[in-house]
Structures are given as C-alpha cells and as structure tokens.
Amino acid sequence: MIKAGFDSKDLAKRGESLIRQASNRYLTTVRIAFRAKQRRFDDFDGLLEESSVKPVQRSIIELSDEQDQPDLLPG
C-alpha cells in the first residue's frame, strides 16, 4: 500500500492534484486533516502497522488514490 521510502516530489504532486481537482479547496484541506487525525489515533490504538510515514502524508496518498481510482471504493 504505502511504502516507507516514498518520493517527496510524488507526494507534492498528489497534494497539488487533490487541491487542483477540488471544487472547494478548504473542504479538501479539512478532509486531509480529518483523515490524518483518524490515522494518528489508529496508530495509537495499534490498528495500523508501524510506519515511518506521517499521518498527513499517509492521508494525502490515500485520498489521492481514492480520487485516481474510484472503482476501488466500496459501494
């Protein structure tokens, strides 16, 4: 899913893509922050494996993947 040695340029491109394709930049920023907060608490609860990727970085990658590959989402 998310590799520990990710490229910072790729992360920046993903973040820019999220903001660029958003109808509301503020809500996109809030979604990223909320997802990061969830991941942080999941890390504390031991629900996620130990990772060197910070929660904000992980949330940008996850939201970008969801945006680029909507067919992977349930429902």
Curated annotation (Swiss-Prot):
Q: Which GO terms describe its molecular function?
A: DNA binding; DNA-directed RNA polymerase activity
One Gene Ontology term of the biological-process aspect is: DNA-templated transcription
What's the top EC group for this one?
A: transferase
Q: Which reaction does this chain catalyze? A: RNA(n) + a ribonucleoside 5'-triphosphate = RNA(n+1) + diphosphate
EC number, as in UniProt: 2.7.7.6
Q: Belongs to which family?
A: Belongs to the RNA polymerase subunit omega family.
**Subunit field text:** In cyanobacteria the RNAP catalytic core is composed of 2 alpha, 1 beta, 1 beta', 1 gamma and 1 omega subunit. When a sigma factor is associated with the core the holoenzyme is formed, which can initiate transcription.
Q: NCBIfam families from the entry?
A: PRK00392.2-5
- Protein name according to UniProt: DNA-directed RNA polymerase subunit omega
Origin organism lineage: Bacteria, Bacillati, Cyanobacteriota, Cyanophyceae, Synechococcales
